[in-house]
């Protein structure tokens, strides 16, 4: 759950979960519905006010790319409104660059730290600036911290999914894609007409899931449509084929990738021991 609280007057902590899109990748950009759920992995930001610093200082060790990204969030927050000087410390358990919503979770945790709980407007401004072209599904799932059905430009609705829907599910890391998400989004948008059928199928998968359809069958159908979009790399395709041959089902979560890795693959109905050793596996049992 998303929460912010002030322990002492000068110390504020806010947490934001990652997200997994069960159905809807890319289709949500074109008005089809999607379903996303929060993950047990999260970003926590601690803010300690200190007037003597005169600025907001980041205390976090990470890759240069992510350090710069988080500093951009802080600088945007400072430019948007009155922010007290102090130190922000970050703790993160969300896998980075893997389609699990880390970039949005950083924004939400940090804006809540700097502006307080009721900062959706400011958080959206930062998200729009740093992640242009986003559909809004990541933001809706992470801000609400609950499973949601999302349709672009509409208020997200909470969706009642079976509590054990991800019981035994695995997240398998196929590696970082060669393409960044904005590049992939642009490429899919440019082919909208030729991709009408797979986009429609992805939208239908959402409705089937809402109607308590067979989750494994829905995942298989969704994966086939994602492959038709061209955002599942050969490496990820091979892995998903192996999983299906073992009786399981799997799909890429998030933007995927044309070449290289495709980020995280969500797998259901298969034991972790059946996954080839070269792939790091995270269990979603919580």
Feature map (PLM): residue ranges:
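DPxDG-like acidic metal-binding loop motif
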Residues: 98-119
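Ubiquitous "structural anchor" signal
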Residues: 32, 107-109, 262
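Nucleotide and nucleotide-moiety/phosphate-recognizing core
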Residues: 86
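C-terminal nucleotide
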Residues: 2-21, 28-29, 36-37, 44-82, ...
């Amino acid at each position: 759950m998303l929460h912010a609280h002030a322990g002492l007057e000068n110390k504020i902590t806010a947490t934001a979960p990652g997200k997994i899109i069960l159905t809807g990748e890319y289709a949500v950009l074109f008005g089809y519905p999607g379903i996303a759920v929060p993950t047990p992995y999260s970003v926590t930001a601690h803010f300690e006010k200190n007037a003597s610093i005169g600025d907001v200082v980041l205390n976090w060790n990470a890759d240069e790319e992510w350090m710069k990204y988080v500093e951009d969030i802080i600088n945007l927050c400072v430019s948007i409104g009155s922010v007290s000087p102090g130190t922000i410390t970050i703790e993160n358990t969300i896998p980075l660059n893997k389609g699990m919503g880390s970039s949005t979770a950083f924004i939400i945790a940090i804006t809540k730290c700097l502006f307080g709980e009721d900062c959706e407007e400011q958080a959206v401004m930062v998200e729009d600036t740093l992640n242009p072209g986003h559909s809004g599904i990541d933001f809706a799932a992470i801000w609400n911290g609950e499973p949601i059905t999302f349709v672009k430009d509409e208020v997200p609705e909470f969706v009642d999914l079976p509590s054990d829907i991800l019981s035994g599910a695995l997240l398998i890391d196929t590696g970082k894609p060669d393409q960044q998400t904005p590049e992939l989004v642009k490429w899919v948008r440019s082919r909208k007409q030729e991709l009408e059928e797979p986009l429609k199928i992805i939208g239908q998968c959402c409705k089937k899931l809402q109607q308590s359809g067979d989750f494994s069958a829905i995942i298989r159908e969704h994966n086939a449509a994602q492959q038709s979009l061209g955002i599942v790399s050969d490496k990820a395709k091979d892995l998903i084929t192996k999983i299906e041959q073992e009786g399981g089902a799997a799909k890429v979560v998030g933007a995927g990738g044309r070449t290289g890795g495709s980020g995280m693959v969500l797998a259901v109905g298969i034991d972790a021991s059946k996954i080839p050793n070269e792939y790091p596996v995270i269990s979603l049992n919580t």
